[in-house]
Amino acid sequence: EIRDAMLAVSGNLDRARPKGSAAMNMKVTELTNNGAEAKRILQVADTSTHRSVYLPLVRTLVPRSLEVFDFAEQGMVTGNRDTTTVPTQALYLLNDPFVQKQAQALAKRVLAPAALDDAARIHLAYRLLLARTATAKECERAQHYLGEYEAAAEKESNPRLAAWASFCQAILASAEFRYIK
């Protein structure tokens, strides 16, 4: 699950079972008309750091992080899920606040060890995200990207963090992160 992988590498994954259910006290009428309570459940699901298996699911309400990546239709028996690669998935990975938040948390995690230089941080990011070290060419390109981004992000309150968050988000959006070899 891509959502769980993003939470895990960012250090935000809450492995504990959540207490209660956001859907437990929901009025039946809310289920049919997607009212305020239904929207609240979607908001809870979109901001939760628990594993996806614990997300509150109501038949007609699927959290955005699951819907965009071929979540199985809840009203039907599904033995095999479709696997697609569509533009909405890339747009989600590049623009969704949830993904941006995980990228920023991951950037903070990569920047935390004070003893590391940027090349070592790039290798750390690659190990966390892709379970391998960066090649020499990837490391060189990443250092160039980070330098350019940091120089251009002078309006940001923390240009270094912004550059690393952007770098981490780019890897989160990569095909290599999304697909297991």
Across the structure, where does each feature detected by a protein language model lie?
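An acidic, gly/pro-interrupted, aromatic-rich
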Residues: 1-133, 166, 171-181
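Short coil/turn helix-boundary motifs
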Residues: 114, 149, 153-156
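Amphipathic alpha-helical segments that form the core helices of the histone-fold
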Residues: 140-151
